[in-house]
Amino acid sequence: MRNTKRAVVFAGDYAYIRQIETAMKSLCRHNSHLKIYLLNQDIPQEWFSQIRIYLQEMGGDLIDCKLIGSQFQMNWSNKLPHINHMTFARYFIPDFVTEDKVLYLDSDLIVTGDLTDLFELDLGENYLAAARSCFGAGVGFNAGVLLINNKKWGSETIRQKLIDLTEKEHENVEEGDQSILNMLFKDQYSSLEDQYNFQIGYDYGAATFKHQFIFDIPLEPLPLILHYISQDKPWNQFSVGRLREVWWEYSLMDWSVILNEWFSKSVKYPSKSQIFKLQCVNLTNSWCVEKIDYLAEQLPEVHFHIVAYTNMANELLALTRFPNVTVYPNSLPMLLEQIVIASDLYLDLNHDRKLEDAYEFVLKYKKPMIAFDNTCSENLSEISYEGIYPSSIPKKMVAAIRSYMR
């Protein structure tokens, strides 16, 4: 029985969720014990909550990596119309991934078999392993499948080198971040066999340039990874490339089919179902909610509701990476009231101007309220709070919140 999880990274936005999930299903159909990191900016928590259960039952996990904030800006130009800005997200892999080695996969691909040999490939001192672009008809390597030496990327600040090179060259390159990756790593990578990134999506290009040798490559058995590059995607209403049906097979496959296959092989683990023991709420008019990241990490069994009457700053939106934090931007007093009614505890943790609605609802519905010493309201007496705790010792707040659990 495998004890360690293999690290995999996908990146994409909510508009691409069907493609992301299809690629994930194909990967999980043939590989278990996967720790999948999904770099994104806008995929809802509910999707993560359900898919995470499936991964956990196969001995893996799913990590929601929110690229929200100025440090994750990806507003570089890209000359390929079928590729959006999220392709640059792979630059930030060392920010989120803790494993020394990680497999990055584009979302427009299908895995057809066991990738153990790929996961176990020794990278040595190379920065990554990748397959040649378009079977040698392209330039350099294709960046859709990368086995990354994450330890080396982290120690040598590769993220910043990629950003600096992109700032300098993005208007001059033809293939976006793929060109940048080729420029930076040049000959400092290992070559993968074509079967690990079989670019079936190049069919249209191969036919255009009369590359008959590509159509002579056997497709039985199927290559281990089919990559539907180019604009000729199999999920379009019409496409002309081969193996469109393989993509649809996995897209329409139910997760139960995948799970039952692993269960039949005695790969079955309990999922960590999210059962909250306490509901807490805060109304904020500020981006700064004291120690909320720390509290969310320390108290996974507590559901934190963060409400604002306006748009929220990135610092608050990024909290959605925690499965136990729900944010409500642009809410209204009557909606806040319903959340307070359903909550067990009011956390007066926001800085700057306080909004009286919160205190009125706390009083009306007799909800207990606690605060840090640097966030309690100047307009309320200490007896309005059931506890005020030092912000310099947040573990005391953790203990206080735990004391209210059912």
Swiss-Prot record:
Changing D108A: Loss of UDP-galactose hydrolysis. Encoded in RD10, a pathogenicity island with an atypical GC content that is associated with invasive pneumococcal disease. Pathogenicity islands account for greater than half the genomic diversity observed between isolates. The main function of this island seems to be correct synthesis and export of pneumococcal serine-rich repeat protein PsrP. Residues 3-265 are annotated as: GT8 domain. Keywords: Glycosyltransferase, Manganese, Metal-binding, Nucleotide-binding, Transferase. Changing D106A: Loss of UDP-galactose hydrolysis. Involved in the polymorphic O-glycosylation of the serine-rich repeat protein PsrP. Catalyzes the third step in glycosylation of PsrP in this bacteria. Transfers galactose from UDP-galactose to the terminal glucose moiety of already-glycosylated PsrP (using the short substrate PsrP-GlcNAc-Glc). Has a very marked preference for PsrP substrate that has already been modified by GlcNAc and glucose. Has hydrolytic activity against UDP-galactose but none against UDP-glucose. This is Glycosyltransferase GlyE. It comes from Streptococcus pneumoniae serotype 4 (strain ATCC BAA-334 / TIGR4). GO terms for molecular function: glycosyltransferase activity; metal ion binding; nucleotide binding. GO terms for biological process: protein glycosylation. Gene3D superfamilies: Spore Coat Polysaccharide Biosynthesis Protein SpsA, Chain A (3.90.550.10). Pfam families: Glyco_transf_8 (PF01501). Its cofactor is Mn(2+). Changing D177A: Loss of UDP-galactose hydrolysis. Mn(2+) binds at D106, D108, H227. The keyword Glycosyltransferase applies. UDP binds at residues 11-16, 106-107, 227-233.
